[in-house]
């Protein structure tokens, strides 16, 4: 699309200019930054196109989450998934949202706990981890696109990403809410509410 081309052109120009930088260390660092920007751009364009094309459907949220967790079998994930919780929404986007949240947790933690429960008017997904957590003052900021945390959870593995921003957009586009809290496992707790 035109937007995709407009966004990629400056990155292509930067990549061409990188070839002229003599200092290998600087060139490598800038090249890594450009690759990360390309990855984020692709991620966002995928999200934008999937969101506009996909129709809402009724699906089993319990089964969806169990299938997502299977992909992460090499990680220490403990789950308590209430059986047969059904929701109405855009299934691929919900999958994307949950993937982004799990990936954010496993990036920083040794152990991740995932729960799915139902209240009178919400399906609630809770993702806890035992990582370094996030300062309470940063809770709102981490949902902003490209926001980078200075320390703790923003250590060496930190990335200026769109994962949490996209997850938040998906939740809100379904009339839901996403909040962060301190986890009882010492790290971060992410609570996602999807209304019926």
Please place each PLM-identified region on the residue numbering.
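Short alpha-helical Gxxx[C/S/T] motif in the catalytic ATP-binding
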Residues: 163, 167
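Conserved catalytic submotifs in the C-terminal HATPase_c
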Residues: 78-89
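Acidic ATP/Mg2+-coordinating residue in the GHKL
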Residues: 129
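Short beta-strand/loop element within the Bergerat-fold HATPase_c
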Residues: 111-121
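A residue-level detector for a conserved hydrophobic packing site
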Residues: 94-98
